Amino acid sequence: MSTPYYPHPIIAREGWPFIAGAFAVALLVQFMAGWLWALPFWLIALFVLQFFRDPPRVVPALAGAVLAPADGRIVAVDKVQDPYLPREALKVSVFMNVFNVHSNRSPVDGEIRNRWYFPGNFLNASLPKASLENERNALWIRTDGGQDVTCVQIAGLIAKRIVCHVHPGEHLARGQRFGFIRFGSRVDVYLPLGTKVNVAIGDKVYATQTVLAEFH
């Protein structure tokens, strides 16, 4: 196992405006109406603070491993048509509820070959049709071993903002942070047929730490 340099604050930058706003409202209500009226606002502020936590993770030193791109629960393991590349693929979907860490991390080492953004709906991200109907951002990653992996950030019922910090031509390392989805969402990973999947529907997974699958 190896712990890479993690150049990110423990509270994600994507959340700083929301955190500042939540605490400012709580302070204002306490000043204007007292602590009893302010208590619900302080609880909301603390919830927002914990939502944007972004702890470093240990990267498994396992050759050929495909790592979980997000914390959450497995809601789909299917053989499907990849919506982004002309192929059949294995789809593994991770659903994040509002209590999970929402930082998104690369499942593999590889070069970003393309990136697509699609505006869309904000259906419950645990539903199968959310993969194709919700707002989403897709990355096509060509691994260092030549495998094609598609990693898709999908907005959810509450999530209204997908953040992706990387672009075609850049190289990602396994476990490298590449984006964030605010307030409930999902990440789909499309893998080549023949990849050994190590998870099942209902399993809890943790970004970078859980090995979703292995290339042969």
Swiss-Prot record:
Keyword Repressor: no
GO function term, MF aspect, one: phosphatidylserine decarboxylase activity
Chain positions of site Cleavage (non-hydrolytic): 184-185
Cofactor, how bound (note): Binds 1 pyruvoyl group covalently per subunit.
Modified residues (Pyruvic acid (Ser)): 185
Topology in membrane: Peripheral membrane protein
Predominant cellular place of this UniProt entry's protein: membrane
GO BP annotation list: phosphatidylethanolamine biosynthetic process
Class of the enzyme per the UniProt entry, highest EC level: lyase
Catalytic center residues: 185
Keywords: Cell membrane, Decarboxylase, Lipid biosynthesis, Lipid metabolism, Lyase, Membrane, Phospholipid biosynthesis, Phospholipid metabolism, Pyruvate, Zymogen
EC number: 4.1.1.65
Cofactor names: pyruvate
Pathway linked to the protein: Phospholipid metabolism; phosphatidylethanolamine biosynthesis; phosphatidylethanolamine from CDP-diacylglycerol: step 2/2
Pfam families from the UniProt entry: PS_Dcarbxylase
Entry's localization field: Cell membrane
GO terms for cellular component: plasma membrane
Post-translational modification as stated in the protein's UniProt record: Is synthesized initially as an inactive proenzyme. Formation of the active enzyme involves a self-maturation process in which the active site pyruvoyl group is generated from an internal serine residue via an autocatalytic post-translational modification. Two non-identical subunits are generated from the proenzyme in this reaction, and the pyruvate is formed at the N-terminus of the alpha chain, which is derived from the carboxyl end of the proenzyme.
Keyword Membrane attributed: yes
Chemical reaction(s) catalysed: a 1,2-diacyl-sn-glycero-3-phospho-L-serine + H(+) = a 1,2-diacyl-sn-glycero-3-phosphoethanolamine + CO2
Subunit structure: Heterodimer of a large membrane-associated beta subunit and a small pyruvoyl-containing alpha subunit.
Family from the record: Belongs to the phosphatidylserine decarboxylase family. PSD-A subfamily.
Task of the protein: Catalyzes the formation of phosphatidylethanolamine (PtdEtn) from phosphatidylserine (PtdSer).
PANTHER family membership: ARCHAETIDYLSERINE DECARBOXYLASE PROENZYME-RELATED
HAMAP family hit by this protein: PS_decarb_PSD_A (MF_00664)
Name assigned to this protein: Phosphatidylserine decarboxylase proenzyme
Name of encoding gene: psd
